[in-house]
């Protein structure tokens, strides 16, 4: 056993190394777990894992059933990185409980216990079994009698070399392996073999066959259920486990199995019943699943009940563990650990792997450990152990006891402490020391004595209040304990206090104004000073709120605040805070902002009629300026936004909180809001009122644009614009259509009960074509009839023209254009003519695909464009009016001319001499399917102009008189009876810079743009004839 002095030296040495290495006791990273090892495993090796960290590296040893495992005495054992390896494990020698023990210079900890068991399954000893003889209808049990084994088993049966399936008549108990047949039938005769499987090793063995035969002495009569398989009276179930309860009965008829809880509670929905209902399975078992369960077996002869109690248990589980503690000598240690479990866990404590008992300084009470007046011998590894009959858990922690002389190396006194006259100063003295030292203070060379101004706290800090200039100087803290003495010195510098000379003053301003709140001080200029401002308790961010706030002043003793374009939101308390390294002070002012009123509140519709609404409201904040008036606004589903409405009184003053809105439309849903105003401006509107609909009234607005005409023979068509919904004044809105022949006295009336109706057609054989009628349209709703529209004249449907146009003639103008001529119909024509319709189609097309164009009025010719060249077209003409088209004229034929030449002029050459430009080009030859060339068009323009001039010539040259200071853009194309041919590429002729120049169509030139000349002289000279 080490002496306390040796422990102190060792601990001091470890603390010296702490800067480079983290020294600590053992800590389990992985603890051993229970192992079920298959005896027939091909890998003849068992590993019990144990991984530990610590510094110094811990030494690992193992215990088996409480006795140390001697690795050196048995070559089969080895420890690899803490884990225990057992080669060729032996069931007799190696079965038992193992524990890993880890030790280093800080102490020892023990792991949880881990059991090593061996799984095996031997063969059945008996070779044959006796024949079982039963009556038909009798219940039967075939015993399995599994051979010696270790590890969980599963059971099945083979019937005549085939698996025996379980159903409501047959059941295999997984507890005993026995096969139960509730009621034997003739088909059950045969050989039965029990099949046993070890679920750990997967090894399977078959029992000897048991023959089953039927007796010849009759059939078993009916009898009530006899429960042969039932779960125990008490079934302990672990938290989170899967619980299986078995129950099966013999009987005739075959009994049904029903499960229920004896306390009347429903069985959890998560529970499952197997095919035969002989097993009730409850997964993830919890406290609420515990209770009394009943199995009810019933048939027509009666029923029987088996009962059992399923109890809940849980292994201990940590709720609170212990943690490492570093404590100074002579102080106290308190640890507490808590664990859940059922039954409730008990606690014990270990120190360095050995039991820890209560004695003078050590008090143990359940999960608490209290050590007083700690000394070096208390250092070590501690473990709290919580256990119940279902398990044991361990929590570990290290207790380090610190013993050292006072040391200021890392906690020197502050070199300079600044304080103001009249202020307070605290000089901290925090040396590292264990146990706690005794403190004394010196000022200069004199020991400080406590008085009403000077106190020394228990933890060594020096406090001086009401500081004066004489308190300046050097101060030394001296710390002493059993192991030595140390000191540290610092200086106190006393400064004059800061004073606010010009504080901010409260002000009353108007929205939009700008002000400056002053904040000017006197202070010790050897100290840095910082001004900050808060607004309603929040620090002003001058970067974020720079649009409104700015620091002004220009000197270190002034921190004035400018507020620009003040808004209502800027009203509140402003605080100027001044801080130096020795003091902090503040000055506050209130800013009152006058502005437009806030929104009125609680706008309510007190009463509403067909055209009025009585409103009331509560005033909102006046923002420090009396409200002078209110404006009422309304909105409907048909309005564009909010609209001001008329009220009584016409002007609502600021002391009136009710008004009547007039001029509303009946049967329209309205909502209202109020806007307040004062001398400063108009405020925000109130929240909208509830929506209310005005009452119904007679309609007052008549349809607009009453007209008509058209339609079919013997019809009078009357049309109008519907009355908007907001002007219909009520439900059941419709129209009354009145009409009479012009000059007659009696009106004919028709009622249309639809607000959407906008057209009425009167049909009668007596209606003559294009006869005038007087027409008016009235309105009505559920309240009654409203007015009629003004009377207007509408003509009945007219008759389409009855005669075709005469003298149809067509001529070709070009390859794409033709012109058509005709004369008005000859003889009496009953229908009015509004114009003519020309139909045309190519000879290769069908007439039904013909195109049509129309003329208006008396026009008797038209031009048709965009046709195909050298193609035969057929044309016919009809007269038309609103009733339709009349008969068609006879068709005439016309052939468009051949297309113009497709080849553009080539080999274009130009020469300039004596201010003239002479252009020459090759003659264009038309193809066989093209019309002959009649001449050429020369298109030219100045470089900076968009308008183009044209010269026509039947020659292949042209002479132009051009200015000297402008480029020319020129194109040339042929023309023929078929129209204009393809154009040449554009030619740029540069301005004339010398007396002679020449070029071709491919040449280019860089030209400078000069001022335009207003006149161009052009002369033509024939070079060759076509």
From Swiss-Prot:
Signal peptide bounds: 1-18
Matches recorded under SMART domains: FN3, IG, IGc2
Region called Disordered, residue ranges: 685-710
GO cellular component, one term: side of membrane
Lipid-binding residues (covalent, GPI-anchor amidated serine): 1000
A GO BP annotation: synapse organization
Pro-peptide positions on chain: 1001-1026
Composition bias, Basic and acidic residues: 687-696
Secreted found in the keyword field: yes
Main location: membrane
Tissues where the protein occurs: Specifically expressed in the nervous system. Not expressed in heart, spleen, lung, liver, kidney or skeletal muscle. In the hippocampus, it is highly expressed in CA1 pyramidal cells and weakly expressed in other regions of the hippocampus.
Protein keywords: Cell adhesion, Cell membrane, Disulfide bond, Glycoprotein, GPI-anchor, Immunoglobulin domain, Lipoprotein, Membrane, Repeat, Secreted, Signal
One Pfam family named in its UniProt record: Ig_3
Entry membrane topology: Lipid-anchor; GPI-anchor
Assembly information from the UniProt record: Interacts with PTPRG.
Family: Belongs to the immunoglobulin superfamily. Contactin family.
Function: Contactins mediate cell surface interactions during nervous system development. Has some neurite outgrowth-promoting activity. May be involved in synaptogenesis.
Annotated protein name in UniProt: Contactin-4
